[in-house]
């Protein structure tokens, strides 16, 4: 009799599940949650499965704090929590692909933002694995967490030292100006009479100390150059002109010889034709070409 009752209840349950599916009622039984999120095409159903996972995570996070649990139970619950968090992330990716909300980046825009943020940030990470509640108090886990904490403090201390060094360097740059490096040493500061003197006074002071006129003023040197050296430059130019004329005469005399000196310079003294002369030459040339083409005799 009981067997028939169970069959009737089972049939009734299947019938009720079919009716709920036809009516659009969402499934919430964790036992019927699909293993692969891609098998769900309905966005509301995917949202429902994500909500059920969040509920399971909350229950297990409370349970893992129980002081009566032994080490094996703690590790088992911690493994379940890691699997549930991975599954929740998979549903969040799938919801985004179905055109739903982006829970991974915009949790603050939803009603359960505080709860989600607390869940996602809970636990301690060690090489991609998370430890929750009493799992962080396990001997091996506690040792690794302490090493990570020391490393984090060392990195923070190093960063703080770098910031302090940068601050000191900035203060030094503000205090130490270009005059510290001797950039303005030659500018008169009112303390050095030699720097304040003009060029001739400095030369006179040097000659007075040495006893003889060792250094001549720049003006005297320039005057000497203008008076003596400039005349030499004029003589050089005159020599080059005479030399060019001689070479040109030599070239004219050797024009009829077979062996011509390739190093002889041509007449560079010849004047360059003016624009009027060039224009006249072009007109005459065009006129001659036109007469030759038409066959006109002069």
From Swiss-Prot:
Gene (name only): ISY1
Protein origin, superkingdom: Eukaryota
SUPFAM superfamilies referenced in this protein's UniProt entry, alphabetically: ISY1 domain-like
GO cellular component terms given for this protein: cytoplasm; spliceosomal complex
Stretches of the chain forming a coiled coil according to its record: none
Compartments where located: Cytoplasm; Nucleus
Family: Belongs to the ISY1 family.
Protein task: Involved in pre-mRNA splicing.
Subunit structure, as described in the record: Associated with the spliceosome.
GO biological process per UniProt: generation of catalytic spliceosome for second transesterification step
The name this protein goes by in its record: Pre-mRNA-splicing factor ISY1
Cited InterPro entries: Helix_hairpin_bin_sf (IPR029012), Isy1 (IPR009360), Isy1_sf (IPR037200)
Keyword vocabulary terms for this entry: Cytoplasm, mRNA processing, mRNA splicing, Nucleus, Spliceosome
Gene3D superfamilies tied to this protein: Helix hairpin bin
């Amino acid at each position: 009799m009981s067997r028939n009752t169970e069959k009737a209840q089972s049939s009734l349950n299947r019938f009720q599940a079919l009716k709920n599916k036809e009516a659009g009622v969402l499934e919430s039984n964790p036992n019927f949650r699909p293993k692969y999120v891609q098998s769900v095409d309905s966005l509301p159903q995917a949202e429902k499965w994500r909500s059920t996972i969040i509920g399971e995570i909350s229950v297990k996070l409370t349970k893992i704090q129980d002081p009566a649990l032994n080490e094996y139970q703690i590790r088992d619950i911690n493994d379940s929590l890691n699997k549930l968090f991975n599954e929740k992330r998979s549903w969040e990716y799938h919801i985004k692909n179905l055109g739903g909300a982006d829970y991974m980046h915009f949790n603050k825009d939803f009603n359960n933002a505080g709860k989600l943020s607390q869940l996602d940030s809970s636990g301690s990470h060690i090489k991609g694995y998370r430890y929750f509640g009493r799992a962080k108090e396990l001997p091996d886990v506690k040792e690794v967490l302490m090493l990570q904490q020391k490393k984090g403090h060392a990195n923070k201390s190093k960063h703080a030292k770098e910031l302090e060094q940068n601050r000191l360097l900035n203060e030094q740059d503000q205090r130490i100006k270009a005059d510290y490096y001797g950039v303005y040493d030659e500018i008169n500061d009112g303390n050095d009479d030699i720097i304040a003197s003009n060029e001739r006074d400095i030369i006179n002071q040097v000659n007075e100390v040495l006893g003889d006129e060792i250094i001549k003023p720049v003006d005297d040197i320039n005057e000497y150059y203008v008076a003596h050296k400039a005349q030499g430059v004029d003589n050089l130019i005159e020599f080059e002109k005479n030399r060019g004329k001689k070479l040109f005469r030599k070239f004219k005399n050797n024009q009829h010889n077979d062996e011509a000196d390739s190093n002889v310079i041509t007449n560079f003294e010849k004047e360059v034709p003016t624009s009027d002369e060039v224009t006249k030459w072009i007109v005459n040339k065009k006129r001659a070409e036109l007469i030759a083409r038409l066959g006109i005799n002069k």
